Amino acid sequence: ILDAIDSGKITNTEIRVVICNNEGAYALERAKNYGTEGLLLSPKSFETREEFNQKLLEALKEREIDLVVLAGYLVVVPPCVIQEYENRIINIHPSLIPSFCGKGCYGLHVHEKALERGVKVSGATVHFVDEGTDTGPIIMQKPVMVEQGDTPEVLQRRIMEQAEWKIF
């Protein structure tokens, strides 16, 4: 997304903050390189989940965020944030929802399940976030062919390159 804004592919858009729960994530370095604020905010840094939830909501409100884009964010978005930003939180999921989604279906697990099932087509889905896991209304999907001999890692890379990076 940062690259698309930088190249002019996406216009009239500003990324005000990149929020990450993983201190070593490349996203924070990329944000810094683009002159965008990077904010490390992990549930592990708070005594209770409620404290984290409120801090996350405050961080978004303080920066007057219009749209929340989840890209590799593996923390469950708290209900207080979903309610405050109803129909303004979008996520990318590395499968064609409703296949291979929901609790436990993230990262390589998605592609392992797809290959175990023997699907011929997988892909990516952009959807609104609601209080379920990968259950919000679908905005867009892009299919990607599964090839003979694919490993989860190879399929993951192909889906990122041919679908996720194109539609998100």
What are these regions (language model features)?
Residues I1-F168:
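One-carbon transfer enzymes
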